[in-house]
Amino acid sequence: MPRRVRAQKRTAGVVEDEEVKAEQVRREHKAKQKQAVGSDAEQEEEELFPDSLHGPDSESDVTDDEQIDEEARQADRDLLKELVTLQGLNGEDPSDADNDDDDDEEEAASDDDDEEEDAEPSSDSSNEASDAGQEEGTTDPHTTTDDKASATTQMVVYSSDDDTSDEEHSLNRVGRIPMEWYEDYEHIGYDLNGKRIRKPKQKDRLEKFLDAFEAGNNGRTIYDPVTGKEIELTDDDINMIKRIQSGQLPDTGINPYEDYVDFFTHEKMQTPVVDKPEPKRRFVPSKWEHKKIMKIVRSIRKGLIKLPTSDDEKDKSSEEEQYYDVWGNEDDPNDPRIKVRQANHIAAPKVALPHHAESYNPPEEYLPTDAEAEKWRNAHEDDRERNYLPHKYGSLRLVPAYDQYIQERFHRCLDLYLCPRARRIRMNVDPEDLLPKLPKPEDLQPFPSAPSLVYRGHKARVTSISCDPTGQWLVSGSDDKTIRVWEISTGRCVRVVTVDAEVNMVAWCPNAGVSIVAVAHGHTVSLICPRVATAAIDKATAVLCNQSIEKPSQGAEEGMRATPTWNRIRGERQDQDGIFFEIPHHAEVMQVTWHHKGNYFASVMPRAETQSVCVHSLNRQSTQHPFQKRNRDVQRVLFHPTQPLFFVATKTHVRVYNLQAQALVKKLLTGVRWLSSLAIHPAGDNLIIGSYDKRLCWFDMDLSIKPYKILRYHKYALRQVCFHKKYPIFASCGDDGNVHVLHGMVYNDLGQNPLIVPVKIIKAHNQTSDGMGVMDCTFHPSQPWLFSAGSDGSIKLHV
């Protein structure tokens, strides 16, 4: 017989003997405890089942009861030691068996004698252990045929109340706690006997690498922080991990989509599905109901609850039989309540009389045309003037039933009982008194009111105009890819420059010492010298543009676009057209605007994914991108006239940034859907915006982030708004072909609100077939004159 089987049998017999001894000690101790007076259940339970992991007390003087407890605990410890020994035999390494071959030969004779003596106890104990294991249900399904004897013993060793515990097969008994608590100690926990488990030697990366090649496990080894050992995963574990990673169930034997069987609506069965015995509480009177009833009985005895008598029941029945007619005195004219009600009665409003269009044979002028009928059908119910279409019938008998009759009666009933009626005293107030007292427009002159000159020459719509600081010249850009310079006083075109794309905007440099025009066309911004100023100004402009500046290497950072390069134009284009620089951009440029000192100008690319705003330095001939985040909503930008503030207008908001602090100062809430234009007062405290939804908003930035005034006087979208630099007037133009001139006085007193008065509506240009009207407008720098650019290709001066 193999040594392992013999050892298992001997150990099983020892285990059985130790169990019998422990049971006898417990019975004796229990008998003595029953004789003791004043013992409670909790103390008896604690003494019967002591903690086997702790050693006995070190006290020398013990009583008889404590001696019995000590014997019981010693028996439990001996039993646990044998179980640990048995576990070591079951999990021993085959190499240990090979090393102990000599010991097996020496102990062969003694083993045979032990087998004869322990044959019956071993068989009995093994049978009892197997029966106990079957009752507990702790048999390992992976046990092989060679380990049948050890499996029966293991069922005794690992019997536990919690079959799902992860510590049953682990030597470390610290429980489910974070193992980080043992990082600063030399041990990682405690074994079954309460002894410390020292940390194994940690391998470095080289040793782990060599072990992986020597073992040949293909990276299947994982580290167990509870035991401090490396565990090799089996094929079943690898397959389970792969199934979990792919979102499947870990166990392949589980079918999550089994056919549903309805036990209670299927065929009738002979035996019930659930037939548990009735619990005892179904046959025993409820203790809690008894307490509630006794509480009510005590309240009745104390007089807190009074039971109804027979007289009370008669009175109650007589009261229930009495009825009251709420409408019985409605016909009594002497009732004072009826008189008050009739005096305060308000008659219901009468139904509106039918109109001529509701006739079955209306006149011809009341019958809608096909276009009007189609427009009525496409309109919303709330937008329709009437809820029916007039029809003409030859006779009354041909008129069909009115399909809106029930709906109208229903709304009439709602109006009668849901709408409250009240008497209101009509106030005799003149509507003119409700309007604010505004000064007369004649008292607010000067302002432009009449057309003076017409500048013709462009073959397509004029998109932008700008006046030079001296007020002598006017530059315009058009969709015909030309830039024209006009003399304001005579209307003569003195220079024409042709570019390679449609011109979106032109802006004259506000510095009177140089003569430079920034032109946005296509993906390029060009700097042009018109050469219409004096010789000294043209020379200063040439010196500024031709100066050589050492530039750093321009490269793109990671994830960003490269900085635009300033391409210097030389030769014939510079001599004839006056183009000094061309700055290419990565998207179409829709706006250019200058700083009030003329050293910087900004360009806007609304369709760019990133870096939609560029700030260019004329003196340094360089470009910066102040905003790196993705923003495709930027429509307009503007420099503050006196402070280092930068306005960035998106479709619905206006953000104000401080260029020195590089921080957001405030965010203005416009309330519009799509912003189109932006202008700031020369003092810098007030701002106006125009939008494509026909609104003009005036912002007092010292007052609030919301509009101070919202003006809705344009019939179509607004294209441009502008302030005069000297006079308290501002203007707006739109696709309706009109230019509105308004008086806007800003007072130095911060406690007084700005005064806004409409003074003139100028019919400047005709609306073209594409729905465009006035594209741009600007004021003369020193005179109360207004220039307007129309989609009809003309430019007009209003004085």
From Swiss-Prot:
Record-linked Pfam families: BOP1NT, WD40
Taxonomic path: Eukaryota, Choanoflagellata, Craspedida, Salpingoecidae, Monosiga
Major place of residence: nucleus
Protein name: Ribosome biogenesis protein BOP1 homolog
Record keywords, A-Z: Nucleus, Repeat, Ribosome biogenesis, rRNA processing, WD repeat
Function of the molecule: Required for maturation of ribosomal RNAs and formation of the large ribosomal subunit.
Chain positions of WD repeats: 457-498, 500-538, 584-626, 629-669, 670-709, 713-752, 769-799
Cited SUPFAM superfamilies: WD40 repeat-like
Organism: Monosiga brevicollis
UniProt cross-references to HAMAP family, sorted A to Z: BOP1
Biased composition (Acidic residues): 58-69, 93-121
